[in-house]
Design a protein with these regions (language model features):
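The feature captures the beta-strand-to-loop junction immediately N-terminal to the Walker
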Residues: 53-55
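Helix-to-loop junction immediately C-terminal to a conserved catalytic motif
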Residues: 68
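ABC-type ATPase nucleotide-binding domains, specifically the catalytic core motifs of the NBD
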Residues: 72, 98, 102-117, 125
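Conserved ABC ATPase signature
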Residues: 135-139, 143
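A short, proline-enriched helix->beta-strand linker immediately N-terminal to the Walker B motif
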Residues: 154-158
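Catalytic Walker B motif of ABC-type/P-loop ATPase nucleotide-binding domains
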Residues: 160-164
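Conserved H-loop
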Residues: 189-195
Length: 222
């Protein structure tokens, strides 16, 4: 999904031109009468990583869903980059009856030229060249998360949304996967928004930091 999207009753963000940027203009978010985000305005360009922090319930995942166009329960305007949006979640969310290769290929359209080649290429890039035919139950947690990264990047996204991807892994493995994903993002001209509770992780990957204070909607950009 791309272009300008508006929350209920808002004027268009006419002053922004459609481009490769992710733009939020005066985004206001309530949940069950709680004011989570108050008039957030920001822009993230290609090749940049916006790191998002905040306490549980502050609205981090809700903000990702707004950026993705999954939820429309907000006021304000969102301009998304032209192209696909991809996710990397805390849980890999792989289909247990499919191999690594087929889990990655599943995100590609049936008529995608070289579908299996694309899946294999990305599995190689995340270090799983020898594990393409393994099923999720045969993989470690780190391997499953690498498949999830390959699956997201195989779609050639313009916008990558990353939600606590390594919080369930031990610190050395989490650090290695973080560095791998950061390197992949650096080689791709895409906009990335990365949510984490780990300040060290966000320090390592962020071009810009957004902290959500939660109710009554405060936030700050570093």
């Amino acid at each position: 999904m791309s272009g300008v999207e508006r929350g209920v009753g808002q004027a268009p963000a006419a002053e922004f031109t459609q481009s490769a940027d992710l733009v939020l203009l005066d985004v206001d978010v309530y949940r069950r009468s709680l004011h989570l985000i108050d008039c957030l305005t920001l822009a993230v360009g290609p090749g940049r990583i916006l790191g998002v922090s905040g306490a549980s319930g502050a609205g981090k995942t809700t903000l990702l869903r707004i950026m993705a166009g999954i939820t429309h329960d907000y006021a304000g305007s969102v301009i998304r980059p032209e192209g696909r949006t991809a996710f990397v979640f805390q849980e890999p969310r792989l289909l247990p009856w499919l191999s690594a290769r087929k889990n990655v290929g599943l995100t590609l359209a049936p008529d995608t030229a070289g579908k299996l080649f694309i899946a294999e290429e990305w599995l190689e890039r995340v270090g799983l060249a020898d594990a393409m035919d393994l099923y999720p139950a045969q993989m470690s947690g780190g391997m499953r998360q690498r498949v999830a990264i390959a699956r997201a990047m195989a779609t050639d996204p313009a916008l990558l949304l990353v939600d606590e991807p390594f919080s369930a892994l031990d610190k050395p493995l989490a650090r290695a996967l973080r560095d791998d994903l950061r390197a992949i993002v650096a080689q791709s001209d895409l906009v990335t928004v990365w949510v984490s509770h780990d300040p060290g992780e966000l320090d390592a990957i962020s071009s810009t930091r957004l902290h959500l204070d939660g109710p009554p909607g405060g936030w700050r950009i570093d």
